[in-house]
Amino acid sequence: MNEEPHAHENLVAKAQRSGDADPEVASTASEKQRSSGASAIAVGTEFPGNPQASRPQSLGMYLLEPFILILLFAYNFSSTVLKNEVIYQSCTAGFGYPDSVCQLLGTKNITNETKRIEEQVQPYAAQVTLAMRLVECFIPAFCGLFAGSWADHYGRKPLLMCSFLGYGLQYLISAAIAYCAMYTQGLVSPWWYVLSIVPLSCLGSSVTYSVAAVCFIADVSGGKVRSYRMIAYELAIYVGLLLGSLGSGYAYEATDAYIVFSISAVCIFTALFLMALLLPESLPARNRTLSTPTTDTSVVSMLKSLWSTCSKPREHQNRFMLTTIMVVLLLTAFVSDGSNSVFYKFMRIKFHWTVKQFTEYETVGILVPAVAGSGGVLFIWSLRKCTNSAILWLALVSLLSHCSSSLMKGFALESWQIYVAIGLGVFKSLVNPMCRTMITNLLPADERGKIFALLGVLQALSPLISSTLYVAIYTRTLNTEPGIFNVFSAFLFGIGIILLGTVWHKKSRNLVYYEPVFK
């Protein structure tokens, strides 16, 4: 998972029986009653077969976001500590330096000798981190091909529980490795941490929880409420990351990596137990059995169904818009994956930050966009009063915020300028929920799972390229200008802005049809 849980949060599966009418078809009668002829893709319309339209909401339906918050708390509580342990054990076990010397890395006790060792160790540690990212990508990418269909057939809750179990096992194994390193003065190879990723990878990583979570939201919410619920989901991610980052540095200074990893494991297994007891299934059994017959769950039929859904022609400019918005989401995931693989190392080599200083920065960096994200509901409400493109506006503003923040990081010469970059990135949390909402509104309910499954696969595969590329850029510029990768990130966000501009242009050519989608 990335600090962007980013990343990870990307998939919506169908919540409608296959025997029911397609929403765009079922609403033909209401279309004829409108003088404008607007499509029934309108977000405020509910259709037969949608679970949220046919049964009352229970309080358990609102427990999803707290569980996601706990997962992201546990993840970020250990994230920076894990990176630091990889560097420390690369120094001791990888290069054979004494424990007393390696303990000084990443502290304020900087000498010419420790700076030389840091520059020698970092490329090696970057390779270990890259290997971990690659292992985390391969199997989840394969699982993602079928995640939408599995979620449609077996329900959302089993996928959520699988993902939580994977993360819990990762931190349990990491705690065991850190415990051994603690009692051998670091003489445990950092490559053992790659082993901790294997159970997480086999159980789907962030792909499965993203599938299940956003499918769950699509099942239990509809109309304009869906965009608000998407923001609440994104906010839960940011608050979880914030709390994890806030406590991580202090816990690490007071204890050690073994305790930090153990706390993360306990939090996730506790959430898993409560989820099994309290979280209801959002997709009724009757919908699951009728929407995806058992005979259609074979690998071949799933792949055929996925391909036919993703490649079929669509009315107006829907296929172009879907593809373009998906590319924007892929660009943001690409930058997040790549940047996060080297950013902590960049801050250590450029400004000599400690773990505590970095986690304090992370706390502020998460808090500011989280507050802006919580205000996203107010922004949407206000924009809907004065424009018919509120969702598209917010996505564009968010990408501009990303771009300016990356440029500031790239050209920063002092530590305080990194905090200025946080202010420039105040709206960066809004692009994902806004793009997901646009895609959801463009699709009928029985196609969301497959379209977003494809997106999830591509996002899961993106670290194969992004992490490799960013590590290569960072190691090549380590001794000259290590922050140049931030400028590359700004360039990619600029491409995203141009792509959303083309969506705006296409939308303006058919306002009657597309206003309900982007409002």
From Swiss-Prot:
Organism classification: Eukaryota, Metazoa, Ecdysozoa, Arthropoda, Hexapoda
Composition-biased stretches (Polar residues): 27-38
Signal peptide residues on this chain, from the entry's feature table: none
InterPro entries: MFS, MFS_trans_sf
Topology class, membrane: Multi-pass membrane protein
Entries under CDD domains matching the protein: MFS_SLC46
Family, similarity comment: Belongs to the major facilitator superfamily. SLC46 family.
Species of provenance: Drosophila melanogaster (Fruit fly)
Tissue: Expressed in Malpighian tubules.
PANTHER family referenced in this protein's UniProt entry, alphabetically: GH23453P-RELATED, ZGC:174356
SUPFAM superfamilies documented for this protein: MFS general substrate transporter
Name of the protein described by the UniProt record: Probable peptidoglycan muropeptide transporter SLC46
Pfam families, per the entry: MFS_1
GO BP term (any one): transmembrane transport
GO terms of molecular function: peptidoglycan transmembrane transporter activity; transmembrane transporter activity
Subcellular location: Cytoplasmic vesicle, Phagosome membrane
Induction: Up-regulated upon E.coli infection.
Keyword Transmembrane: yes
